[in-house]
């Protein structure tokens, strides 16, 4: 199944979760903190403005991005869980 985000929405694949703590302790599933960075998988056409024009997206497919801990909604695509969020929920692009 393919998903094409609409307007200013972005589909993000979350980065892998850390399996160990900073002190070297192996973390179980419930103790692992979900990373707040990932890779852009798909983008919409941009935000529609009141005057009818479309504001182009700043992010593109392949960008590594930072986002808030509670940003986006999880969506299941095939056997993979991705995040759908608005571009404004993205805090920055990792260079």
From Swiss-Prot:
Gene3D superfamilies documented for this protein: GroES chaperonin
Transmembrane region(s): none
GO function terms (MF aspect): ATP binding; metal ion binding; protein folding chaperone; protein-folding chaperone binding; unfolded protein binding
Localisation: Cytoplasm
Annotated keywords: Chaperone, Cytoplasm
InterPro entries: Chaperonin_GroES (IPR020818), Chaperonin_GroES_sf (IPR037124), Chaprnonin_Cpn10_CS (IPR018369), GroES-like_sf (IPR011032)
Annotated Gene Ontology cellular component terms: cytoplasm
A biological process from GO: chaperone cofactor-dependent protein refolding
Pfam family, one: Cpn10
SMART domains: Cpn10
SUPFAM superfamilies: GroES-like (SSF50129)
CDD domains for this protein: cpn10
Known function: Together with the chaperonin GroEL, plays an essential role in assisting protein folding. The GroEL-GroES system forms a nano-cage that allows encapsulation of the non-native substrate proteins and provides a physical environment optimized to promote and accelerate protein folding. GroES binds to the apical surface of the GroEL ring, thereby capping the opening of the GroEL channel.
Assembly mode: Heptamer of 7 subunits arranged in a ring. Interacts with the chaperonin GroEL.
Family: Belongs to the GroES chaperonin family.
PANTHER family: 10 KDA HEAT SHOCK PROTEIN, CO-CHAPERONIN GROES
Protein name: Co-chaperonin GroES
Organism expressing this protein natively: Francisella tularensis subsp. tularensis (strain SCHU S4 / Schu 4)
